[in-house]
């Protein structure tokens, strides 16, 4: 349904552009666990608040997850565009009253709903907003009961904000030109959604 797909895109990005929900074929999908960052950081030494300058690139291979706008500033890229993005808020909780063993997702393109996606991951439940929620507990209870048919108490409810939750594309030729420039001139290899400024879903990483 093009109308519904376009409404959803407008709701989450402010633009009409392709989204992964266009594909309605049966597929195995992947959603990051709540502790995804801590899992992949396990065993690594992480130094916070470190400054990085162009002069520090010494030709050794570097895998960078630094967001493209920041990396353009570091290397002095002359043709820096606007990087459109929108913040999102994710409400996580645990279903308390039932043993749930299904994974299901519902999209909400209607602008009257403050949330845009709900995901059931076993007993974990995620409700995602494109605006700061002010009654998340009530929203969770309503969505679970009315849309998923699960009338249950929830526990461990908390909300996380992600500043660059939804990014919008920039000129693809410029994007690729900059990524190639980083590799050619500094031996820097960009990894991830923000470093490549491309909408990447976890399915792409697994594949």
PLM features: what roles do these ranges have?
Residues 1-10:
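N-terminal FAD cofactor-binding segment of flavoenzymes
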């Amino acid at each position: 349904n093009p109308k519904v797909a376009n409404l959803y895109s407008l709701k989450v990005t402010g633009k009409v552009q392709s989204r992964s929900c266009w594909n309605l074929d049966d597929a195995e999908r992947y959603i990051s666990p709540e502790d995804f960052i801590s899992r992949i950081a396990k065993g690594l030494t992480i130094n916070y608040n470190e400054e990085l300058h162009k002069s520090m690139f010494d030709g050794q291979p570097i895998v960078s997850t630094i967001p493209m706008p920041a990396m353009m500033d570091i290397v002095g890229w002359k043709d820096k565009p606007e990087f459109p993005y929108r913040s999102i808020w994710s409400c996580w909780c645990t279903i308390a009253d039932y043993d749930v063993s299904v994974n299901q997702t519902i999209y909400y393109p209607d602008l009257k709903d403050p949330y845009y996606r709900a995901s059931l991951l076993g007993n974990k439940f995620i409700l995602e907003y494109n605006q700061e929620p002010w009654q998340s507990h009530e929203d969770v209870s309503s969505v679970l009961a009315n849309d998923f048919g699960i009338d249950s108490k929830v526990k461990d409810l908390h909300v996380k904000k992600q500043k660059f939750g939804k990014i919008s594309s920039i000129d693809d030729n410029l994007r690729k030109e900059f990524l190639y420039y980083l590799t050619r001139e500094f031996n820097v290899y960009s990894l991830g959604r923000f470093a490549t400024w491309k909408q990447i879903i976890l399915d792409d990483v697994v594949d």
